[in-house]
Amino acid sequence: QMCIRDRGSHEFYMGYAVKNGIMATLDMGHFHPTEETYDKISAMLLFTPEILLHVSRPVRWDSDHVVILNDSVQMLAQEIVWADALNKVNIGLDYFDASINRIGAYVIGSRATQKAFLQALLSPIKQLRDYESSGRFFQRLALLEESKSMPWAAVYDYFCLKNNAPAAEDYIATIEQYEKEVTSKR
């Protein structure tokens, strides 16, 4: 499917995409510093069957760089999962940063994104919704706060080990070895 990338007026590109039946791209690096991409997902999905996200860590008005596990990426994953939109959102990661190893940058970004989605998927969504729909906002907020300290990192390490991938920071040595044995000889 054809896609249009947002590099100017978001409203113009969104309208153009909807009018012409093409997928719009939301680029995390191309919005005003006070705007958050995750705030736009649910609204856009009311008018278009799917969207493409360019996930990055914006360096304000400069360029996009390696994705890290920051609030924006966590909220992005949470919005997609909580809106039950995993099958409607296509995700591309930015891993460019000329100052660091590109394989390392790619791995950092991929793992950060996986961790954000894992956190969102492990959230007690049903209970949070039940509290909200019954007007029990204290309970909802308390559970939301408690869910922030769930042991999701242990779950992620287990996921890595089950898939023969290095857990925790063990990937650093693997990338250093690959750099020494392969990429340094190019």
Label each region the model flagged.
Residues 7-8, 114:
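Non-catalytic scaffold segments within catalytic domains of secreted glycoside hydrolases
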